[in-house]
Design a protein with these regions (language model features):
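Acyl-donor-binding surface of acyltransferase catalytic domains
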Residues: 2-16, 99-188
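Conserved donor-binding loop and adjoining core beta-sheet/short helix segment
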Residues: 18-121, 235-256
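Conserved acetyl-CoA-binding loop-helix of GNAT-fold acetyltransferases
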Residues: 106-116, 258, 264-281, 299-304
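C-terminal region signature
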Residues: 320, 324-326
Length: 326
């Protein structure tokens, strides 16, 4: 364990939600293992220079692009990094990767000071992963002093695979089947479905980006990339990949896209139930994914399958900053 890891070891786990802690006796080790690669990039100017060259903004110093350890009053600190929403250079923000500050008024106020150290990038706000969305929003909104404003970015929905397997089968389960699909074909099909959806949901690309062939390679290599069939007819794409994060182990949803002719019939839940039965899950593994709170069809589908909100990313805007649009 590095000195930085030891410093963050206990305090940063305040930001891990209760369900995650309840689901696995190894949650703390899982959390530290997930965090460590980001800690290893603190001060890594080689990595920072690579990101600088890719983004092409007039900020030359590679150390400013690397993950950074920011010292805060009262002996607190935060590991942070400059990021760009959907790789859009007009939407810079600072990611709070880990911190010794607490998820309370004092902690949020401390973290608000981080943005000044990134003035070269003109960040709009901070992004935080909070253990309980409603609590975090209430704390910020009802603070006796103005510490800023906040709104959700992405919800993290998860549940142990063993519990999901115990759920009652969806009415459409028997009509649905899955068959392996190569990444190129799956990506093309997904792109078609997203284009079709965008006509009725113009903000879709702010919520979700269609998985491309490269991003589906991992799911395919794990035999977890499928075409969804309904009564033998193509209906969409579903994919998952082993990804451990936030203190849990398990499988992250990489894609689920249902075409217009099959939407609204419970096909998504049935497809998820078929996928669950193909996961090579260990005892404490979960199925999880990120969903934007305005993406109501995806949110309803995930919750109908039994997944629950276990934490969330929020945009936190201290006074004097522009903030991130929904």
């Amino acid at each position: 364990m590095t000195e930085l890891s030891a410093r963050l070891n206990e305090s940063s786990t305040q930001w891990v939600s209760s369900p995650i802690k309840d689901w696995s006796p190894d949650w703390k080790g899982n959390y530290q293992a997930w965090l460590q690669p980001s800690l290893d990039l603190v001060g890594d100017t080689t990595w920072g220079g690579t990101i600088r060259d890719l983004v092409q903004l007039p900020v030359e110093d590679p150390s400013l692009w690397a993950n950074r350890l920011i010292e805060l009053p009262g002996g607190h600190c935060a590991v942070t990094g400059i990021r760009f929403r959907n790789r859009d250079i007009s939407k810079p923000f600072v990611d709070i990767i880990a911190t010794t500050a607490s998820p309370d008024v004092a902690g949020f106020e401390l973290l608000g000071q981080v943005l000044a150290t990134y003035r070269d990038f003109q960040p709009l706000c901070l992004r935080l992963n909070v253990p309980e969305l409603n609590d975090a929003l209430r704390i910020i909104e009802t603070s006796p002093t103005n510490i800023g404003s906040a709104h959700p970015d992405l919800l993290i929905l998860a549940r142990p695979v063993t519990e999901l397997l115990a759920e009652q089968l969806a009415p459409a389960y028997q009509a649905v089947s899955l068959r392996p699909c190569p990444p190129s074909a799956a990506a093309a099909r997904t792109f078609e479905i997203y284009n079709e959806l965008e006509a009725s949901r113009p903000q879709l690309r702010e919520w979700a980006v269609p998985a491309d062939a490269q991003s589906l390679e991992g799911a395919a290599s794990e035999d977890l990339l499928f075409e969804i069939l309904v009564d033998g007819n193509p209906a969409g794409v579903i994919a998952a990949e082993r990804t451990n994060a936030y203190g849990f182990t398990g499988f992250c949803m990489q894609e689920i896209a249902i075409d217009s002719s099959h939407r609204g019939r419970g096909i998504g839940v049935a497809a998820l139930q078929h996928l669950l039965r193909k996961l090579p899950a260990n005892e404490h593994d979960v199925l999880w994914g990120h969903i934007h709170p305005d993406n109501l069809p995806s949110l309803r589908n995930a919750q109908a399958s039994g997944r629950q909100i276990v934490s969330a990313h929020i945009w936190f805007t201290p006074p004097g900053y522009s903030g991130m649009n929904n």
